[in-house]
Amino acid sequence: GKRKNVKRLCKRWCDQVMQIEQFFPTNISNSFCPFHNEVEKQLIDHCFSISKTIKKSDNIFQNNGQLYTTYGTHDILLDEKFERLNNWIKDEVKKYVDTLRMKVNLKYEGNAFFNIYKKHDYQETHDHAGSIISCIYFLKSNEKSSRVFFKSRMYDNIEHDSSNPPTGNVWFESQPGKLLIFRS
């Protein structure tokens, strides 16, 4: 008697359990450049050299106003010193697109730039309008460097527990040689 009632209650409860499925994920690739140590110093020196000769961009993307950026002033896709790294990044983007079975014609149009962050420099959350895929490559950083945060593109006015990855912000440590690839 009691055992049958418990089974019946359990079955009824199990039949009514809510199933939550996750759709429209944000796919973020996270990989490390296998030759980062070979190019790191040369590219860091090159970036600092550029920062001394090319004025920082006046573009007003949101930051504290101190951030040095070559956005719109120096396209590193056209800079020969970045060629090896750019080619590796293009290969990684192709893998990302192929893995996600995206039907997109990769022309690698657009631009690439670098930012030099000092203590207290930051950027606000932003989108890359007009782009399909974006990348972030960390040339230099340390354990005190800021993390990169991603938040859902879906407007949500309900605060969630940040320990619940599908609903909270997601972040990545900035580590030398790390490449993040994501939908713009």
Residue map of PLM features:
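N-terminal amphipathic/basic-hydrophobic helices that include classical n-h-c signal peptides
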Residues: 1-17
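Intrinsically disordered, low-complexity peptide-like regions
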Residues: 3, 13, 61-62, 113, ...
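Non-heme Fe(II)/2-oxoglutarate
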Residues: 13, 17-102
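A short, polar/charged loop/turn motif at coil->beta-strand junctions and beta-hairpin connectors
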Residues: 22-25, 106-108, 176
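Extracellular-facing segments of soluble proteins and assemblies that are Gly/Ser/Thr-biased and enriched
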Residues: 87-91, 95, 99-119, 125
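Catalytic core of non-heme Fe(II) oxygenases with the double-stranded beta-helix
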Residues: 110-181
